[in-house]
């Protein structure tokens, strides 16, 4: 499921993962997956289903990702749209 999604995502956003890894070399594969889902506009409950997590876990992962990316006041969605 992820492999198919990733293949389709890369067709639409060919440099997304490369740019994200350049901006944050320590980003994990799981965080990249979360970023891709967020970039497509998925809501937390849908992301939770895709990742087999609870929606609260997705919120925590998003918070940790914001910290890792040092976003300050910029929203994660806006940041990812700009990549």
Place the predicted regions along the sequence by residue.
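Cytosolic nucleotide-binding catalytic cores of signal-transduction proteins
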Residues: 2-83
């Amino acid at each position: 499921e992820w492999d198919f999604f990733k293949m389709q995502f890369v067709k639409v956003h060919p440099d997304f993962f490369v740019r994200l890894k350049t901006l944050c070399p320590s980003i994990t594969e799981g965080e990249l997956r979360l970023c891709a889902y967020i970039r497509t506009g998925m809501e937390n409950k849908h992301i939770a289903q895709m990742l087999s997590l609870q929606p609260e876990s997705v919120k925590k992962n998003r918070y940790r990702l914001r910290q890792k990316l040092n976003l300050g006041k910029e929203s994660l969605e806006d940041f990812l749209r700009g990549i």
